[in-house]
Amino acid sequence: MKPSLFVGVMSGTSADGIDVALVDFSQATPALVGSESHAYPNHIREHVLGLCTPANNEIDALGQLDVELGKLYAHAVNSLLANTQTPAAQIQAIGCHGQTLRHRPLGSGYASPFSLQIGDPNTIAALTGIATVADFRRKDVALGGQGAPLVPAFHAAVFGSTTTDRCIANIGGIANITCLPANSHIAGYDTGPGNALMDAWIEANQGAKYDAGGAWAQTGKLNQPLLEILLQHPYFALPAPKSTGREDFNMTWLQACLNQTNLPLPPEDVQATLTELTAISLTDGVKRSCPNAELVICGGGAFNTALLERIQHHYPQKPTVTSQQLGIAPTWVEAMAFAWLAMRRLENQPGNVPAVTGASREAVLGGIYTP
């Protein structure tokens, strides 16, 4: 059978770089042909994080970063195609999520909800010679939805089972769950912080980009008073559909919570407590929405041993596994999802799940940008 090749490009809330995946959709189960990760240059990451924080942000800075990210995404795609010896002419489309700078969905207090991703798809298409699908979230928002999470439709397509209840937990900067009951309807939402707070805290205190394996967290002790303050964030009490981002969970908020404790906490204790926050908020969502389901972890959090241990502790019903056990490496699930969403766009098939996002109907997502 002739390959059906698409490229997925993903930059998540962690704002640490680019995951790019070459996927063949010609068979019932998607095949990962090749994949690469490209770290953001330091100055690009600083610009992204700067524009993620509400301030007197310059339009000039936004416009330039939009194009610079487009160039980086194109470079990542071209590198992957070269290393897999795949001609650009064989690729049907690139699906590029872009870099989220602001996510203000329905319920966040804004009269006109919006979700903003940058990474110019015109630049990507021009520099790769490949049609590029981008701007996936705003149609769902226009239909009254959260615009997130968008991966549940892909999760259902590749991880759904007619015999086993599953819950797919994607732990990136933000954590989200997709409930896949056997022979029933999909549910899902963002549960709260994933890696974002843990990454920001270790970078501020240790100079590391992330807590490898959760090793630093394991040297600390859970601080119960701090955990209780963190869990008072109003997001956790909101009903689904709901989605969140850095706007809700960031270092400014964390510092305010630390100030409330009136305690001089060792930084490793804070890290251990942030790990617990992610584990509790995620497993609370699983227990509420899909109790007794098999819990499958993907995203960067799948490599945090300390976090997985705490998740298993709070959700002992079934062994916690990673998506590797279902045939897809945890690192590449999201990039593959946006390759799949690009395929859905070319086929004029819906990519959202209204039961998850709250949109008024299913919709074809994304715009097509030709070379």
Curated annotation (Swiss-Prot):
Which residues are listed as membrane-spanning? none
In the UniProt record, does the keyword Kinase occur? yes
Question: Its Enzyme Commission number?
Answer: 2.7.1.170
Give the record's keywords alphabetically.
Answer: ATP-binding, Carbohydrate metabolism, Kinase, Nucleotide-binding, Transferase
Gene3D superfamilies reported in the protein's UniProt record = 3.30.420.40
Q: Name one GO molecular function term.
A: ATP binding
GO biological process assignments: 1,6-anhydro-N-acetyl-beta-muramic acid catabolic process; amino sugar metabolic process; peptidoglycan turnover
The record ties this protein, via Pfam families, to:
AnmK (PF03702)
Record flagged with keyword Transferase:
yes
Q: Which HAMAP family match?
A: AnhMurNAc_kinase
Q: What does this protein do?
A: Catalyzes the specific phosphorylation of 1,6-anhydro-N-acetylmuramic acid (anhMurNAc) with the simultaneous cleavage of the 1,6-anhydro ring, generating MurNAc-6-P. Is required for the utilization of anhMurNAc either imported from the medium or derived from its own cell wall murein, and thus plays a role in cell wall recycling.
Indicate the family of this protein: Belongs to the anhydro-N-acetylmuramic acid kinase family.
According to UniProt, the name of this protein is: Anhydro-N-acetylmuramic acid kinase
What phylogenetic lineage does the species belong to?
A: Bacteria, Pseudomonadati, Pseudomonadota, Gammaproteobacteria, Cellvibrionales
